[in-house]
Amino acid sequence: STHCISSAASDVYKRQHSDHIDAAPELSRLVDAPVYLHPTDGFLWQRQNPGAHYRQLLDGATFTIAGTDLRVMSTPGHSPGSVVIYAEEAGELFSGDTLFQGGPGATGRSFSSFDTIIHSLQKSVLDLPAETVVRTGHGDHTTIGAEAPHLEEWIRRGF
């Protein structure tokens, strides 16, 4: 499906953990913009924000912000509904907590899974062009080319 979002004020949350979404309901109200969230994280959203609404952000969905086409890619692991947002023409991936510089995102939280995040990286992320810049949810940016060669090392170390 294609969504045209006329304002960058829409809130897109790539995973449902408090370090990223605590202010979402209030921000949504203040700027009159919807919150977008993968439905698999809906139970976590409702646990923290009872009765608060969100719009579904589904795997493969595309939308445009400020003239940039973006594609949603489901990458469970950090949370059940984690997604990354890929701006193919810009050569950028907004990875949230799915991929950091130096390894996969954290999986030590409730509802996280190391095996699942590794599968997500193999299935959706590490096959992107090597020059793709990865804008992470924490820390410095990196590239797919800098990270992909280390997959087996991450699997061996278990994080």
Question: What are these model-derived regions, one by one?
Answer:
Residues 7, 63-68, 87-89, 128:
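Glycine-rich phosphate-binding loop signature in dinucleotide/nucleotide-binding domains
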Residues 1-9, 13:
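Single conserved hydrophobic/aromatic residue that forms the stacking wall/gate
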